[in-house]
């Protein structure tokens, strides 16, 4: 290698190892970031699309795990979903930074190494990329971008066990339903914005679910590691969330929600995480949101190993 080439290479090196920036990333940028991570860490990552949005954008899922490409006996399946309301954008960036954190700390951080070795972690940063494209930063309260391109709220679009949901199933919803059916997910959470609370099932019934103690425990496990959420009074106009958690229906009823669909139809426990008072806050706040949620997102994944794990084989 010549001296000139060496200097060029050294000049490029900081760009190659530069940390992910704290800003919002559009769909093209998000795709490029995921493909770059996959190319740099091929042994422990897998990137796939579960379908397309109304406008044809891919719904990318990024997998981190020692066995990333397929289910392995004894390795539980975990998922995080963000940005199903397109204008609720913080969770989208939290998941990108979580990916970076897992990859860059694998084999150097004992907790991360154990998680990646013993868990198959699926991350869907944007369930509603069309809505995200239609929304704008610093919009805290409007519904611009909340819905998919066809005008449907994706968190009101799933089958509901408590009352019939007659809305046509949207492409994004269908893709997620197919994804859930194709994997044996055990634990999940989906990210939202507009409040600071961890919400658990049921969303559309005041009936106490059979696993109520487990659901409350999981919600509090996330909340107690996020001091802003746990304080229960972080957002103006919100109060009464003891320890930063709430039953979904007690807060407000949701028909056709993804949380209940996971739990009732697929035996996958899911909680809903409201992680920012402002739905689409200024990008300058993103590093703070990552710092607030970093411990929680790791601690919550660890809970997939709580209790007994069984694999049933039918011959």
Language model features with spans:
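Cleavable N-terminal signal peptides of Sec/SRP-targeted secreted and luminal proteins
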Residues: 2-19
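Acidic/histidine-rich, surface-exposed loop or edge segments in extracytoplasmic proteins
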Residues: 16-22, 80-82
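Soluble metallo-hydrolase cores and metallopeptidase-like ectodomains found primarily
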Residues: 22-78
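Soluble or luminal CAZymes and related metallo-dependent hydrolases
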Residues: 26-29, 167-172, 214, 285-292
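Active-site/substrate-binding loop(s) of hydrolase catalytic cores
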Residues: 67-220, 224, 228, 232-236, ...
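Short glycine-rich, acidic/polar surface loops and turns
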Residues: 246-266
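Catalytic cores of secreted or luminal carbohydrate-active enzymes
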Residues: 266-308
